[in-house]
């Protein structure tokens, strides 16, 4: 690792956010308020089961009411929508999360839009997307992964990114597009690119802040990185291990070994963005509980970008 490269520990930052969430939850409980999180999982996909279990454990650790609804793979879409309607009407539930992906016979878009915007802690409802796109961050729920990435960026650069060039590689509705909007709100000059962008490496070399969220293992090579840049690697890819024996290992979308010799700051995979996603899910659930009960919502961004 270069002497000047800072390793951004998402685990440490996530732990500090969880500590804040716990403290605010204790304060709410003094007023008889317990944040409630309901997670819906359809089918028995092993990866989804692991994700849901980790979210449930973290919610309980934070002192939340944590409820899991497990539905069979062949559940009718109507039944899923009815469950969401009942959770929308349940005052003890402040956040609703539907674990994706859903089976093919279920319209994921319809399901996401059925969640009340006030309980849409994933930030996928059109109303929350629109608020983020127009800069109404005070009342928007921001998708958890870009929200976490933004806090990591703030830890390096502060809340005002004026004069800095940011390149987001990835155009998904879950990470790329909301990430670009958050960077714009912080006054960065933003370019959003993707795997089909011409001369992508040239764009990346101009970035003071480089966000990699394209889902291709080690696509961003070290010589694409501007010396001293901040690199946030959102990718989580499982590839064959360098050792024999058929083992696998996790890598990001960035060539990490090369990046640490060139970047000013970089997130590792694992241990970078991943822990931040769950931490921000807990933060959004807490904020939803505060809003539902006319309580002041806490700050989680270093400069109040996320409230």
UniProtKB/Swiss-Prot annotation:
Q: Which BP terms from GO are recorded?
A: L-histidine biosynthetic process; methionine biosynthetic process; purine nucleotide biosynthetic process; tetrahydrofolate interconversion
Q: Which GO terms describe its molecular function?
A: methenyltetrahydrofolate cyclohydrolase activity; methylenetetrahydrofolate dehydrogenase (NADP+) activity
Give yes or no: UniProt keyword Oxidoreductase. yes
An example of a Gene Ontology cellular component annotation for this protein is: cytosol
Q: Which transformation does this protein catalyse, written as a reaction? A: (6R)-5,10-methylene-5,6,7,8-tetrahydrofolate + NADP(+) = (6R)-5,10-methenyltetrahydrofolate + NADPH; (6R)-5,10-methenyltetrahydrofolate + H2O = (6R)-10-formyltetrahydrofolate + H(+)
Specify the domain of life of the species encoding this protein: Bacteria
Q: Which UniProt keywords apply?
A: Amino-acid biosynthesis, Histidine biosynthesis, Hydrolase, Methionine biosynthesis, Multifunctional enzyme, NADP, One-carbon metabolism, Oxidoreductase, Plasmid, Purine biosynthesis
Positions of disulphide bridges: none
Q: Which SUPFAM superfamilies match?
A: Aminoacid dehydrogenase-like, N-terminal domain (SSF53223), NAD(P)-binding Rossmann-fold domains (SSF51735)
- EC number of the protein: 1.5.1.5, 3.5.4.9
Q: Which residues bind NADP(+)?
A: 170-172, 195, 236
InterPro entries linked: Aminoacid_DH-like_N_sf, NAD(P)-bd_dom_sf, THF_DH/CycHdrlase, THF_DH/CycHdrlase_cat_dom, THF_DH/CycHdrlase_CS, THF_DH/CycHdrlase_NAD-bd_dom
Q: In which pathway does it act?
A: One-carbon metabolism; tetrahydrofolate interconversion
Among Pfam families, the record links this protein to:
THF_DHG_CYH (PF00763), THF_DHG_CYH_C (PF02882)
User: PANTHER family per the record?
Assistant: C-1-TETRAHYDROFOLATE SYNTHASE, CYTOPLASMIC, C-1-TETRAHYDROFOLATE SYNTHASE, CYTOPLASMIC-RELATED
Q: Function, please?
A: Catalyzes the oxidation of 5,10-methylenetetrahydrofolate to 5,10-methenyltetrahydrofolate and then the hydrolysis of 5,10-methenyltetrahydrofolate to 10-formyltetrahydrofolate.
| Assembly information from the UniProt record | Homodimer.
Family, per entry: Belongs to the tetrahydrofolate dehydrogenase/cyclohydrolase family.
Q: What is the name of the protein in this document?
A: Bifunctional protein FolD
Q: Which organism is it from?
A: Sinorhizobium fredii (strain NBRC 101917 / NGR234)
Lineage of the organism? Bacteria, Pseudomonadati, Pseudomonadota, Alphaproteobacteria, Hyphomicrobiales
């Amino acid at each position: 690792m270069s002497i000047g490269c800072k390793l951004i520990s998402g685990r440490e930052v996530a732990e500090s956010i969880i500590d804040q969430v716990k403290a605010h939850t204790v304060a709410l409980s003094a007023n008889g308020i317990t944040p409630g999180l309901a997670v819906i999982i359809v089918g028995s996909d092993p990866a989804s089961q692991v994700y849901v279990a980790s979210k449930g454990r973290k919610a309980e650790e934070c002192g939340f009411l944590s409820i899991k609804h497990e539905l069979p793979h062949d559940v009718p879409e109507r039944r899923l929508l009815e469950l969401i309607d009942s959770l929308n009407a349940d005052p003890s539930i402040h956040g609703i999360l539907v674990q994706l992906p859903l089976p093919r016979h279920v319209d994921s878009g319809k399901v996401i839009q059925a969640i009340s915007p006030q309980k849409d802690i994933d930030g996928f409802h059109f109303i929350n997307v629109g608020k983020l796109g127009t800069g109404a961050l005070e009342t928007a729920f921001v998708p958890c992964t870009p929200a976490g990435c933004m806090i990591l960026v703030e830890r390096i650069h502060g809340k005002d990114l004026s004069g800095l060039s940011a390149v987001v590689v990835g155009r998904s509705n879950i990470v790329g597009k909301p990430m670009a909007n958050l960077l714009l709100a912080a006054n960065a000059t933003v370019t959003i690119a993707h795997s089909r962008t011409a001369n992508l490496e040239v764009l990346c070399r101009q970035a003071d802040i480089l966000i990699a969220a394209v889902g291709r293992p080690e696509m961003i090579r070290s010589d694409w990185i501007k010396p001293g840049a901040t690199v946030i690697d959102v990718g989580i890819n499982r590839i064959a291990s360098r050792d024999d024996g058929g083992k696998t290992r996790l890598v990001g979308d960035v060539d990490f070994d090369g990046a640490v010799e060139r970047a000013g700051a970089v997130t590792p995979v694992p241990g970078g963005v991943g822990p931040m996603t769950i931490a921000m899910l807990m933060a959004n659930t807490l904020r939803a509980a505060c809003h539902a009960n006319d309580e002041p919502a806490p700050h989680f961004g270093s400069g109040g970008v996320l409230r």
